[in-house]
C-alpha cells in the first residue's frame, strides 16, 4: 500500500518545523514536499499534526525469552509502536542470554516472527552476563548484534572490560555499559540522599555510578573503542563524560525521560513504582542532566523500558525489582515537561529521540529523507490526555506517572511503509 500524508508539519534539514506532505511508495519515503499529488496512494489527512521520523530507542528490555510474564516481544513492540518508536535495541538480560550462536539465532527468529517494529538485539559481553568469560564477539556480530553490553549489571573486572573494548574496536562495534561499582551499591534501593535518610532505607551513592564511568572512560581511551554510557544519572557522571569528550575520547551517553522529569524530591512515598536503577537522584544531579543534554555532553534520550508485573512491584520498595515502563509515555512526558516549559525546543526533542541515537550508532534511521525506509510517527501536539496504565499495550503497568496530564501523543506509527499502530479515529 502507498500512502500520501497531506497537510502535516515536519522538521526539515535546517532543523525548522515547516508545512509538508509526505508520499510513501513501496515501503520507502518517495517525496517530502508541499502540495504532492499521487494517483496510486491512499490519502491520509494529517490535519497539521507533526510528521516525525520514527523514534529510536537504544535501551529497552523486552524480557523474552525467559521473562514472558513481564513482557513479550509482541507486547513490547506493540507498546513501542504506540509510543512512536520504530527502531528499538533490546538488552541481553534475558534467559537465556544472547551470548552464543544458538541463543542469538533463537532470539532473531523470535524477533522476525513477532516484532511489530524494528528490533536490534544487543550481544552480551560475557557468557551468561556472569563477568568471567567473554563471548564470541565475531559470531554475535555476524548474527546481527547491535553492540555489546552486560546491561543490568556492570562489568566489574577491569581487565575483562579492557579486553572487550579492544575486541569490539577491531570489529568497529560499541561497548555499552550499565555503570555501577558493586562494592558501593550498599544493598540500596533508592538514592543515598534525603529520601533514603527520611525513610531509613539503604541508599545507592552517586559515586557508585561516576567512579565506574571514570574507569571505563580511561579503558576506552586505551582501547580506542566507542564507549556508550547507559542512563546517566549524576552530576559527577556528567562531569567526567564532559571532560572525556573534551579530551577526544570516544564516549557517548544517554539519559532517560524519568531522570529528566523527576528527582528524589518528587517521590511521594515508599512507592515501588518510583524504584528504578539508577535511582532518582538529587536536585543538583537533575539540573546537571538538563545542562549536559543541552551542551552535548549527553547525546540522546533512551527510555530504559523495564516492565514488571504488579505482583512483583507489590513486594515493597526494598524487595520489588528496579525499573519502570517507558515506551508509551516518553514523548508526551518530555514534550509537556521540557518543551512546553521552554527547557528545550521541539526540534531538539525530535533530534534527541531520532537522529542523534541513529547517527551515534550508524543506523539508517532518524530522518525523513527521500529514498529511506518509511519509518514514521505522526504526533498530535495539541492532544492532552491523562496517563492511564490500564490502557498500556505493554504488559508492564509499572509507572510513576499515572494520572499525569500530558500533551503530544503519537496517533499513528508506520514501520517499513506499513501502519504498525493507529489511534482509533485519530486521523480523518
UniProtKB/Swiss-Prot annotation:
Encoding gene, per UniProt annotation: pyrC
Entry protein name: Dihydroorotase
Catalytic activity reported: (S)-dihydroorotate + H2O = N-carbamoyl-L-aspartate + H(+)
Organism: Bacillus cereus (strain G9842)
Listed GO MF terms: allantoinase activity; dihydroorotase activity; zinc ion binding
E.C. number: 3.5.2.3
Domain of life: Bacteria
InterPro entries in the record: Amidohydro-rel, DHOase, DHOase/Allantoinase_Hydrolase, Dihydroorotase_CS, Metal-dep_hydrolase_composite, Metal_Hydrolase
Pathway as given in its UniProt record: Pyrimidine metabolism; UMP biosynthesis via de novo pathway; (S)-dihydroorotate from bicarbonate: step 3/3
Enzyme class at the top of the EC tree: hydrolase
